[in-house]
Amino acid sequence: MLDALTFDAGSTLTPDYMLMLDSRDITGNISDRLMSMTLTDNRGFEADQLDIELNDADGQVGLPVRGAVLTVYIGWKGFALVCKGKFTVDEVEHRGVPDVVTIRARSADFRGTLNSRREGSWHDTTLGAIVEAIASRNRLEASVAPSLAGIKIPHIDQSQESDAKFLTRLAERNGGEVSVKMGKLLFLKAGQGVTASGKKIPQVTITRSDGDRHHFAIADRGAYTGVTAKWLHTKDPKPQKQKVKLKRKKKEKHLRALEHPKAKPVTQKKAPKVPEAREGEYMAGEADNVFALTTVYATKAQAMRAAQAKWDKLQRGVAEFSISLATGRADIYTETPVKVSGFKRVIDEQDWTITKVTHFLNNSGFTTSLELEVRLSDVEYETEDDE
């Protein structure tokens, strides 16, 4: 339930906010003109977005310059406001009649170096070292999940590719999510409910009475039942080929409604250690209808990580759930683990992760809409070699 907000019975909650332009508080300048403020907290490299609509019926609203920095705080009167970060103004609109000014700002300045194409190569390094180097040259502070930072990268090229796209490619290959928030380049494990530093994000409990609308759907997972990735050692002349299959370990308590109809229990086998094959194919899931990754990876480990990352992404999309909270929650962020109650059993029994948060605020109300996906934090894997 919404236990973060406690107030006297019968009292009325009033929305509150503070807006800073560079280092100047301009809240008083816009409070009588504010029509709406929408703040979208996105997962991944899709920048967070701030949209402000101001009434300009008298024509006295000054247009901010592109590149100006807005810092926004939102919440409720009588409670500490929550800082939602810094946003760079990159769009300004004026329309009428009636005359309205729309200011659109994003959490990362994509007119800057993050979006500039670069050439480069990385040799015998780690994922963490690459992220830190890219953060440094973009004047950002890097924060990389420990489980990802130590991943070895024998070689990778960045060819006519922006840092934003290159980091996204690295994240997709290694089961991560990358984003820029409040001056930090975050590289964390997707859907695990932990911060980039490895700390667990406190779980939020939401009851049906907290919201006024919700939507739940189970996706057709029959579209793909598995993922394959190939690897090839170009330095090893031995003509060995190996197939490796990845399957989820059977959990004692698993939500049957979200379980793939072709899922089968697997008996764990301990195979003797053998030299890694020069060439091979790795599969996550079942072989009935397979999504084949087109990239040929340099090592078996890289192929395994890429296939597992893609398979996890497909599995997280097994069900979707969204809810609009009648009472806005400024303290909720993406990647927050959520437990819900008061809905159908299939919804209540599942662990969820927030993938998108949209706050809508004006002078009379404040609501928060959440989009969630299935959380896979407890999933374990085992492999079978098929020589």
Task: Give the predicted meaning of each segment.
Residues 74-76, 189, 342:
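Conserved "cap/hinge" positions at secondary-structure junctions
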Residues 86, 128-131, 164-168, 226, ...:
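Extracytoplasmic/secreted envelope proteins and their assembly/folding machinery
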